[in-house]
């Protein structure tokens, strides 16, 4: 699939693997200053109720700007989580159910991993479309169709929906904490083991496999490898390459209807570490793929 990230939206075709691949995202914008396009991207919701989900960190780096852009043409309400380390658990989702206006027409998530996951799940359960305004290139869930949540202290993956739009302003993304930049690169490098596991599953379990999707994921891996040295200097083109690779990784999951192209044994380890820390009372925010960046 030789398409740019923005051209992947609305993709729908029969692949040589025998499966119909589709991408149910209307708009993807990645680049400098693209946050300013938000009112145009959601213009069909002008005059309607928009609910913004953010935390104290993401409010400062992007949430204020989102409100400023939307306050004239949209009915805006919001909820700002003030937890230092927000977890995607029952308490967090329950709070959103208390705060979201009854007649909300659109959810706008401002953040990255946790904010995106809880917003996707909330939108799916309530039948409300959502848009994600990314703030860090830290994980591959922006374009995913599932939400990993913590239920009864255990990491469980629930069905979700594609976002209506993904907006990742590189001017914002490149200023994320360095650990989050490294985690995003680590998440991409982890696709090598994920793809290897997919091959093993094909051979041993006779699982479905798509060479074209594998090729798509590998092409993004190569771009990120070549640009990896620019992470420490927050090079804009490097951050854009990582961001686009993370989004494409999520798209690959949706295209095949399974997490195989992007998630293998390394994700099981990551989930175990996260649950161990949380259940031991350690509130330290665990970033998936930190194990992949330990040598950077």
Name these PLM-found stretches.
Residues 20-22, 45, 99-102, 123, ...:
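Solvent-exposed alpha-helices and their adjacent loops that cap or buttress functional pockets
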